[in-house]
Amino acid sequence: MSIVVKNNIHWVGQRDWEVRDFHGTEYKTLRGSSYNSYLIREEKNVLIDTVDHKFSREFVQNLRNEIDLADIDYIVINHAEEDHAGALTELMAQIPDTPIYCTANAIDSINGHHHHPEWNFNVVKTGDTLDIGNGKQLIFVETPMLHWPDSMMTYLTGDAVLFSNDAFGQHYCDEHLFNDEVDQTELFEQCQRYYANILTPFSRLVTPKITEILGFNLPVDMIATSHGVVWRDNPTQIVELYLKWAADYQEDRITIFYDTMSNNTRMMADAIAQGIAETDPRVAVKIFNVARSDKNEILTNVFRSKGMLVGTSTMNNVMMPKIAGLVEEMTGLRFRNKRASAFGSHGWSGGAVDRLSTRLQDAGFEMSLSLKAKWRPDQDALELCREHGREIARQWALAPLPQSTVNTVVKEETSATTTADLGPRMQCSVCQWIYDPAKGEPMQDVAPGTPWSEVPDNFLCPECSLGKDVFDELASEAK
């Protein structure tokens, strides 16, 4: 069944209430989706996009109920991905000579999916127009890498409707088509989820492309997206949100996520969160176990956050696989203006936290001090985790902290013995980690104030796991 969008524009798309996976299994569409196709009937009849390939036959049959297929004069393909152009083969089998208007890159993508180079392709570029009669034109705007190289938008003069492709859309299924008809909380939650998980890597392109489109000085009464609602009520509100999200977006929020084998790393996460909340009660803190949480919700929270803490147990000297996979995905999303800290527990040897810190730094995060615990953290170790959270809260504060938290008393780390009496600091000759007698190494039950001579012989360097024999007196303190 078609829905009138405006005047002679009809929605002829497909709702998909059941879909739960998108882009393979990388995006969870918890509220379904829609594949929006539009039929414009003027002196010339234009079809903008089709639907997902799994609905090809149903789409063509429904379209035949709306219009004699032979009366379709032009097909516009804003994007060649299968959820947009998937029904082309089924449709073109009925009307093989119908002109297809798309970008040059789209021809490559369409042929790659459908293998019909004989189709009547017509390449368009930014500023090109197509007269469709009754004084109306289609104006094409290339939008490469938002989010594919072939992407473009199409603007209809007279009706002032922007067919925006993936931009401004959301994977959200509802019987109502327009933004003012649906649950606003659900809608904007899905808009942000969509941007965070799909468009974040291209944020540097969003602002100049929107500026370019606004530079045409064309009125926009509606934005007709490829997924989700049509924006008819104050359509520029979603444009303003995109400009905000593209500008290195962050809220006063910290996301903590982890994976754990024996709940030790979970205990650390809880204690760190307590320290953050104790020091800065204004900050929102969200905690996720990656094995039990929706990955896209985690990534959306990272997008919203000023920083994140990532925890992992050590398994075979490396991080847990789910954490490794999530870090790889964040590398591709190219988050900006975010801070990060790694933490985790280990047994006889470590390695995961250092590896995780390196990977997070490579992913573009500004790194803060990491934290490790050996075996199951006891009360002293948990207090160190809380203190780590307090320090993170202080370092990452976006505004001066409330005075009551600035003066929080922190447990003294050094004994009454003077630093000089404790002897020199010792440095690992392999990884350069420094043992400070004044601080000790509580994770290995070496109390603050323990001189090197009293450190147990089974002590291991926290960074490289080698023994005491690789340590030398710190050069700057050698006599």
Curated annotation (Swiss-Prot):
Record bears the keyword Magnesium: no
GO cellular component, one term: cytoplasm
Superkingdom, natural source: Bacteria
Classification via PROSITE patterns: FLAVODOXIN_LIKE (PS50902), RUBREDOXIN_LIKE (PS50903)
Pathway: Nitrogen metabolism; nitric oxide reduction
Subcellular location: Cytoplasm
Binding site for Fe cation 1: H79, E81, H147, D166
Main localization (coarse): cytoplasm
SMART domains: Lactamase_B
All residue ranges annotated as the Flavodoxin-like domain in the record: 254-393
Residue positions binding Fe cation 2: D83, D166, H227
Note describing how the cofactor binds: Binds 3 Fe cations per monomer. Binds 1 FMN per monomer.
GO MF: electron transfer activity; FMN binding; iron ion binding; nitric oxide reductase activity
Keywords: Cytoplasm, Electron transport, Flavoprotein, FMN, Iron, Metal-binding, Oxidoreductase, Transport
Region: Zinc metallo-hydrolase, residue numbers: 30-210
Binding site for FMN: 260-264, 342-369
Domain Rubredoxin-like, first and last residues per copy: 423-474
Cofactors, names only: Fe cation; FMN
Residues annotated to bind Fe cation 3: C428, C431, C461, C464
Subunit structure: Homotetramer.
Described function: Anaerobic nitric oxide reductase; uses NADH to detoxify nitric oxide (NO), protecting several 4Fe-4S NO-sensitive enzymes. Has at least 2 reductase partners, only one of which (NorW, flavorubredoxin reductase) has been identified. NO probably binds to the di-iron center; electrons enter from the NorW at rubredoxin and are transferred sequentially to the FMN center and the di-iron center. Also able to function as an aerobic oxygen reductase.
Similarity comment: In the N-terminal section; belongs to the zinc metallo-hydrolase group 3 family.
NCBIfam families, per database record: PRK05452.1
Protein's name according to its UniProt entry: Anaerobic nitric oxide reductase flavorubredoxin
Organism: Escherichia coli (strain SMS-3-5 / SECEC)
